[in-house]
Amino acid sequence: MKRTHHCGQLDKTLAGQQVQLKGWVQRRRDLGQVIFLDLRDRSGIVQVVCSPEVSEEALKAADRVRNEYLVAVSGIVVERNEQAVNDKLATGAIEVHVRELEILNVSKSLPFQIEADTDAAEDVRLKYRYLDLRRPDMQEAFAMRHKIMKSVRDFLDADGYLEIETPMLTKSTPEGARDYLVPSRVHHGQFYALPQSPQIFKQLLMVSGFEKYFQIVRCFRDEDLRADRQPEFTQIDIETSFLDTEDILAMTEAMMEKLLKETHGLELKRPFSRMTYEEAMNRYGSDKPDTRFGMELIELSDVLKDTEFKVFKGALEAGGIIKGLTLKGGADKLSRKDIDALADFVKPYGAKGLAWLKVDDEGIKGPIAKFFNEAQTAALLAAMDAEAGDLLFFGADKKQVVFHALGALRLKFGKEFQLIDENAFHFLWVTDFPLVEYDEQAKRFVALHHPFTRPKAEDLDLMETHPEQVRAEAYDLVLNGFELGGGSQRIYERELQEKMFKLLGFSSEAAKEEFGFLLEAFDYGTPPHGGIALGLDRIVMLLARKSNLREVIAFPKTASASDLLTEAPNKVSVEQLIDLNLSIISKRS
């Protein structure tokens, strides 16, 4: 039986026509002399009816059918009477009266129902991922993923970009997270690494004169996982010669504008908002701020410079800062127990505690109210735009501790008290990142993005004297508090790249050992170039309104980097280890 139509495509215009369908049985209802089947394929669901008036043989076959049996049916499209119309189905105005039914395959009892909403535990869904992916909302998410990838490819192709593949087996270099290593059978004791990104190769393609490159590429990072991270992920990788930062930002905005219009019918406002790294941290406590709601961090170091409260005073004397957060109407929203729990909430961010005050008609109340005189209270309330019923929170410590603690608290309040417009898409460029930051544990500077990021021209002289003050010609694209990706202008002169490696603690010998091939390439007329890499999985997650990346990756890993479906990673045979000249040793405690 050859399929003539898809289930979700049938409507009243086909009434009276014979159709042949194939799909899975979503639901079966046996009324004795009539059996109703909800037949599902990728396009949707249609009701098919098996009755003795149309076909005794089809009714007998339908009697053997159960949920998720795969069947082929042939029948006539019939318009339902008005009382029988199902408004919940796109095909609810019609049904198919079956003349012939063939069971193509059977199904065991299901571990969970194939429905849009499921209460199945995630580990069960991942173990039976092939069933989970049958659910309509999962099918829709992957249809959107395809649409996004096609939109990106079409846009970049029209703009003159070439899609060029780069190696999956490459050299391990010290440029970021831990590598996934692949042992070489031919070269005993040596290893390939799976790429964390095609960064070096795409720069070499610019040296090669391709000028405009892109790739939708798989990347691998052996790092701790969270809701928006996976060990293998896909990024939209773009590199171009002779374009400056403004050109790259404009190109990316145009691509996202096309993408949102095609997937959601939205017209984006361009140019996107911009904010420097310093401004983002000061206002939102984050380098990827969610700008769908206000509640900005308030600078209080000057207002409270004469404070006698030891915690505040000590922070200022140690070169730290004081910032505040106003929760409007919070006095009635949070109990003392709730407030105490917030002190525990901020501790993982380095905060030693969380000072707070309630505002009422008489002024301020709380454990630290006694440390404020009348003038200080007035100045504080004015600075924090506070009124009766508000709850005020304070962070006093090193800059980064205050930023991270209050930034996280701000997001927590935004979600808990429904301050965020969940239907909005707020794009934001964050620019002027520090080129490097000092790693206290490693006792050296590390690149904030990667070692190939170009310093701002006006800051070049600071690289040797005050490297922590050097800004990068780098930019991140943020959507609703998630970093979609980032990019930069790249270093393309050997001398400057060697200076960058030296700043990061590489000796001349180590730099040559790890990156000699790139340094040599820079001796052959390398053009100015820059680019951007955007996380495809994260884009799909946000546009499909999913809560984590596992919902938009067909076969994802768990939080422990395991695949519950295939049971990877797994042990390999002794013979395989011998081929690779490897042996397993226990890690020393």
From Swiss-Prot:
Coiled-coil region: none
Region (Aspartate): 199-202
Keywords assigned by UniProt, alphabetized: Aminoacyl-tRNA synthetase, ATP-binding, Cytoplasm, Ligase, Nucleotide-binding, Protein biosynthesis
Primary location class: cytoplasm
Localization terms from the record: Cytoplasm
Pfam families assigned: GAD, tRNA-synt_2, tRNA_anti-codon
Amino acids binding L-aspartate: E175, R221, H449, R490
Gene Ontology MF terms: aspartate-tRNA ligase activity; ATP binding; catalytic activity, acting on a protein; nucleic acid binding; transferase activity
Transmembrane regions listed in the UniProt entry: none
GO cellular component terms attached to this protein's record: cytoplasm
Superkingdom, natural source: Bacteria
Enzyme Commission number(s) of this protein: 6.1.1.12
GO BP annotations, alphabetical order: aspartyl-tRNA aminoacylation
PANTHER family: ASPARTATE--TRNA LIGASE, MITOCHONDRIAL, ASPARTYL/LYSYL-TRNA SYNTHETASE
Record's function text: Catalyzes the attachment of L-aspartate to tRNA(Asp) in a two-step reaction: L-aspartate is first activated by ATP to form Asp-AMP and then transferred to the acceptor end of tRNA(Asp).
Quaternary structure and interacting proteins, as annotated: Homodimer.
NCBIfam families according to UniProt: aspS_bact, PRK00476.1
Recorded family membership: Belongs to the class-II aminoacyl-tRNA synthetase family. Type 1 subfamily.
Designated name of the protein: Aspartate--tRNA ligase
